[in-house]
From Swiss-Prot:
The gene is mntP. GO terms for cellular component: plasma membrane. Keywords: Cell membrane, Ion transport, Manganese, Membrane, Transmembrane, Transmembrane helix, Transport. It is found in: Cell membrane. Belongs to the MntP (TC 9.B.29) family. InterPro entries: Mntp/YtaF, Put_MntP. This is Putative manganese efflux pump MntP. It is a multi-pass membrane protein. The lineage of its organism: Bacteria, Bacillati, Chloroflexota, Dehalococcoidia, Dehalococcoidales.
Length: 193
């Protein structure tokens, strides 16, 4: 998988982190920089870690699935992307999550796991595509950290409803990457991304 594809996947995966960061920023009057860095760093670490876990889980079954690899990668990315779009359009009331402090402890752990579950399946897709997992995990972690940080910084300036469309955009990116993988393997197209 190309570096550009990995970057787009990283951006797609980071959409949930961005939306949650905006939500947290919108519900806290003022957040100290160290808290922002702690939350953004945790999001980045969990995204990278889940990709690695998914990758190595995928390697254990690679011989069995090599004949269907492109369909599996497409299906996983399509499922994740469509689920992200669906969840974004559902308009779940994130205000209910604020009852628990999402900037530390169990609240932070819970939201970090929730925003990184998709990365687990992407790690499996990376194993199928024989992607350089070290570079992919590093990029996904750094992009998630950066996007989360930006979400916090922009949270007070952006309407809370905007986070819904960020989730839709992230889902569409993952669906597009899935379609790209399918086209490359079934039609022999060499798509730049």
């Amino acid at each position: 998988m190309s570096l550009l594809s990995v970057i787009f996947i990283a951006l797609g995966l980071s959409a949930d982190c961005f939306a949650v960061s905006i939500g947290i920023a919108c519900t806290h009057a003022s957040i100290k920089s160290r808290v922002i860095w702690r939350v953004a760093g945790t999001f980045g670490l969990f995204q990278a870690g889940m990709v690695v876990i998914g990758f190595f889980a995928g390697l254990s079954v690679i011989d069995i699935i090599s004949a269907f690899d492109h369909w599996i990668a497409f299906g996983l990315l399509l499922f994740i992307g469509v689920r992200m779009i669906y969840e974004a359009l559902q308009g779940e009331d994130d205000q209910e999550l604020v009852k628990l402090d999402l900037t530390r402890g169990l609240g932070l752990l819970g939201v970090a796991v929730a925003t990184s579950i998709d990365a687990l399946a992407v790690g499996l897709a990376f194993a199928v595509e024989e992607t350089n997992i070290g570079l992919a995990a590093l990029l996904i972690g750094l992009v998630s950290l950066t996007v989360s940080f930006l979400g916090f910084k922009l949270g007070n300036r952006i309407s809370f409803m905007a986070s819904r469309w960020v989730g839709v955009a992230g889902g569409l990116v993952l669906v597009f990457i899935g379609l790209k993988i399918l086209a490359e393997h079934t039609l022999g197209w060499d798509i730049l991304l």
